[in-house]
A protein has these predicted regions:
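Extracellular loop-to-transmembrane helix junctions
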Residues: 3-8, 32-59, 217-219, 224-229, ...
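Juxtamembrane transmembrane-helix boundary signature
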Residues: 46-71, 233-237, 241
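Transmembrane-helix boundary/entry motifs in multi-pass membrane transporters
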Residues: 2-5, 35-39, 65-93, 111-117, ...
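Membrane-interface interhelical connector segments
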Residues: 177, 238-260
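Hydrophobic, membrane-embedded alpha-helices of multi-pass small-molecule transporters
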Residues: 5-24, 43, 91-94, 98, ...
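Hydrophobic alpha-helical segments and their helix-loop junctions in multi-pass secondary transporters
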Residues: 21, 95, 128, 149-176, ...
């Protein structure tokens, strides 16, 4: 990456870390925010502010220390076992994403084709494993094109729905919420924390490529505005269609109610989920190979075991997995956020001390 990153590019990259298939499917946004009614909108604002603040903090910490690896940014002290634990937890989160995306494809096949969910998930796992086995991780860049297309499609569908259906205050009544998320406030913090934990390794290496120091703040703020705009559009549209919120893929259900838009959205969702799952599985395989020579030499066996485990995990269902895996990592992510904040304070004090002594 030789080209310097400006404000707009950083904003798109920052937002792209969160605007995945789970986000624009509507399931994730509804569980974390929509289910809490009007207060959920306050939670959304809080989550975006936290993501923006921690994003800037992370970029500045990386710039100040020169550290780009996730484990060293989170764990300041050189404690090998603790840094390894962070790496293992990250790999486990990526594996959880594979399970969630496989379940999502299974739900998609059920909604669009009437296939049993388990069969759709099984087919998805076979395709994901094949892509990983034949070294097609690089082709994931092709599938990532589906993400911005999904964002545009989601906003268009939301706009059409809102144009046809009047949005009233009653539409934002609170519904059934996930007990693991507690109140709207804890749900917001949890959402910000698990997303922060999942993207530390993506954002940190960008620091040395920024055009100027101020780009970190401006780009992150603009990215937050984009996140907020998409989320508000999705939540407002779903608020007018309570029946869609009960579907595994709420925005797909809403799109199908608008006619042919459902087919287009289904294809985009499939590409987005498939790309996310392949890249996540390849990352897990790569990490395992780096940590163990035996696993590196038995990559195929490891791939088969992970695929079987991912299929088993997918049977818990797309909505239930999002409502369980993400909250668990959200609480772990809270610890990661605090550790990064502590690291940032320590680095700033160390810099001030060096400046005072003239070193």
């Amino acid at each position: 990456m030789q080209q310097k990153i400006g404000t707009l590019r950083l904003a798109l990259t920052f937002a792209g870390c969160f605007l995945g298939a789970g986000y624009v499917s509507g399931q994730e946004l509804w569980q974390y925010f929509g289910a809490f009614g009007a207060r959920g909108l306050l939670g959304l604002a809080l989550a975006v502010v936290l993501l923006g603040g921690t994003g800037v903090l992370l970029l500045r910490l990386s710039a100040r220390t020169g550290i780009e690896t996730m484990d060293a940014l989170i764990v300041r002290a050189d404690i090998p076992w603790l840094r390894t634990a962070v790496g293992v937890l990250t790999a486990a989160l990526l594996f959880g994403v594979v399970c969630i995306m496989a379940a999502g494809i299974g739900a998609l096949g059920n909604q669009m084709l009437g296939l049993p969910v388990w069969l759709g998930a099984a087919i998805a796992c076979v395709l994901i494993a094949a892509a990983a086995y034949f070294g097609l991780g690089g082709m994931v860049s092709v599938f990532t094109v589906a993400v911005p297309c999904m964002i545009v499609a989601a906003l268009v569908i939301a706009g059409i729905r809102l144009h046809r259906t009047e949005l009233t205050a009653a539409a934002f009544a609170a519904g059934d919420t996930n007990p693991m998320l507690g109140s709207w406030a804890t749900s917001a913090v949890n959402y910000a924390a698990y997303n922060f934990f999942a993207t530390v390794g993506i954002l940190a290496p960008l620091t040395r490529h920024l055009k100027k120091p101020g780009t970190a703040v401006c780009g992150t703020v603009l990215g937050c505005v984009l996140l907020l705009a998409v989320a508000l559009g999705v939540l407002a549209a779903l608020a007018t269609s309570p029946e869609s919120t009960r579907a595994p893929l709420p925005m797909l259900d809403l799109a199908c109610r608008l006619g042919a838009a459902g087919v287009v959205y289904a294809v985009l969702l499939f590409l987005g989920m498939f790309g996310t799952s392949v890249s996540s599985l390849v990352a897990v395989l790569t990490y395992a190979g780096q940590k163990s020579a035996w696993l590196a030499g038995h990559r195929t066996v490891l791939l088969l075991v992970l695929t079987a485990a991912a299929f088993a995990g997918s049977l818990f269902g797309f909505g239930d997995l999002i409502g369980t895996v993400y909250p668990v990592y959200g609480y772990l992510g809270m610890a990661a956020m605090l550790l990064v904040a502590e690291h940032a304070v320590h680095a700033r004090r160390a810099g001030n001390n060096r400046a005072a002594t003239g070193d």
